[in-house]
Amino acid sequence: MRLEAKDIYAGYGKIEVLHGATLRAAEGEIICIIGPNGSGKSTLLKTVFGLLKPTKGTVSFDGKDITRLEPEQKVRLGIAFIPQGRNVFPSLTVRENLEMGGTVLDDEKAVQHAIEEALESYPLLKRKIRDKAGNLSGGEKQILSLARADMVKPSLILMDEPSIGLSPRMIDEVYLKIAEINRRGTTFAIVEQNARKALSMAHRGYVLDLGRTRLEDTGAGLLDNEEVKKLYLGG
């Protein structure tokens, strides 16, 4: 199993948000995590990445216990995290943002090679290579966040609300890129309020509620689930 989070309890100070949440993702899978606001979805991703330390439970990656590792250690293992909110450096150019994504590469030559590969894969960014990231649209910033995370070809990408605030056209573009990267074998764990979009391409999905994993099924299975339809798919 590429990623497995078991019986996770975590939160912020004395406020516990997760109460035994569990998820798993096999190599090459796209999994999505849906649920109401405040259910602990983002907290779960932050705990997997190491931004929060669980009070109970374990996180394993390719069979290795990584529960207590720091985020920078997890990056070197091949895990990338794209938080909610267009995680770019607004005062830096598109190229400079991509360079920041290559900091774990061995040398400058490797970084520049990765940038050239990224620009071939993301033509939208190639056209704006000298623009400040802060001047990009919301969708362009999300594409830049994804391209920067993809610079080191991680084996697992964690994404928090990739479609929030985007136009339907840009949502489609972001998810097309996710599908393209996934075809290389990269695993994705995606927290998403746009449940229909995420479940339609997910191999498996999870419903989180009140800090617990309430449902697990294939993406198609959750799309057909009457309770999920009523609560998260508009009927």
Model-inferred region functions:
Residues 49:
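Helix-to-loop junction immediately C-terminal to a conserved catalytic motif
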Residues 157-161:
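Catalytic Walker B motif of ABC-type/P-loop ATPase nucleotide-binding domains
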Residues 13, 69, 94-113, 121-123, ...:
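ABC-type ATPase nucleotide-binding domains, specifically the catalytic core motifs of the NBD
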Residues 34-36:
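The feature captures the beta-strand-to-loop junction immediately N-terminal to the Walker
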Residues 57-64, 77, 110-115, 217:
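Conserved ABC transporter NBD signature motif
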Residues 132-136:
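Conserved ABC ATPase signature
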Residues 149-150:
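ABC ATPase C-loop
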